[in-house]
């Protein structure tokens, strides 16, 4: 999951009006749980719990495979083999034309494969469950932890890179689909597990561009995205705009700074102004806020400049991420450009480069009862999945999954057995609601 943004929120709570995503506070202190567990319970007893559960075993095996973005092949092959052994027809979609080492996994029940080319068929996949198999670095091995005073297996903590983001969602979605298909073999389900979500979404973009897998009109009336949402349904997430502010000057000896032009001195006023844009009212040139998402936030995440303290710096640059609470990314670009021009007096040594794609806030569906409702600040593959219109109306989009974003990219990434198991039930509830809609 792309960084920024509560642990287990009760899935039994009825739907409520969404609250702004910022600020959110963790609901449990996972670092202390991982760091302070003792060894009164043997590792064998913890392993026995996992070995006895197909869900937990699959999750363990997937997390144990390193799949940092760009190196997803082994994890993809594992998921593809598992699905094929459970009566799915699996399509490995290459993400680049240069190599087939990186691929998305698209799978449908074998009994329905003949209808894949029939986008209007009642047996073609109409409900899509999707998440991503890539993770951020570094790889952290799978491990199990239990509080010495807690004998409830549901509270066992499963730690490691990807346990939360997003291999927990991948595992729960697969086992939810298997449960549904066992009871309803003709359920029109499709599974899509993509690469590259953490680094720009090239996997989902490749799927979107496939006329075979993503035909027009769309065969899907429901898409269920898997990300760590603390088992809440997400009413939407903020938009995103990324850019670089750069400045150039002229190098000179720092003892005679008037002989040069400092790129850092030139860029500082621009960065100071950009850093405040989320706090400035729109009528005064700032970025917009909304009741649903709160205020737009700005993060200057990286800065570079100069070569030594005794040299007037000739170059400087900074990377900026804006989480948009309202408006479009095009409108936000204009706000940023005007702010930089105004504060620098139009200094042509300072430029803004919008090299990354952006998108506005993503509103999502929350019409299935029995879930807590929230909004989040982080980005997802939701805007990267571009489905074609359907003649019968819009496609419903849901965002749900186990675990919390607060640990998703940290060295304390972990979730509990209970959260993973509850996610299976939650995904089944979302699938069944979609099946009921299509039958009515």
Curated annotation (Swiss-Prot):
Residues 1-16 form the signal peptide. The keyword Glycoprotein applies. Zn(2+) 1 binds at residues 165, 198. The active site is at residue 197. GO terms for cellular component: extracellular region. Disulfide bonds: none annotated. SUPFAM superfamilies: Bacterial exopeptidase dimerisation domain (SSF55031), Zn-dependent exopeptidases (SSF53187). Binds 2 Zn(2+) ions per subunit. Belongs to the peptidase M20A family. Its EC number is 3.4.17.-. Glycans are attached at residues 87, 149, 353, 372. InterPro entries: ArgE/DapE_CS, Bact_exopeptidase_dim_dom, Peptidase_M20, Peptidase_M20_dimer, Peptidase_M20A. Keywords: Glycoprotein, Hydrolase, Metal-binding, Protease, Secreted, Signal, Zinc. CDD domains: M20_ArgE_DapE-like_fungal. This is Probable carboxypeptidase AFUA_6G06800. The lineage of its organism: Eukaryota, Fungi, Dikarya, Ascomycota, Pezizomycotina.
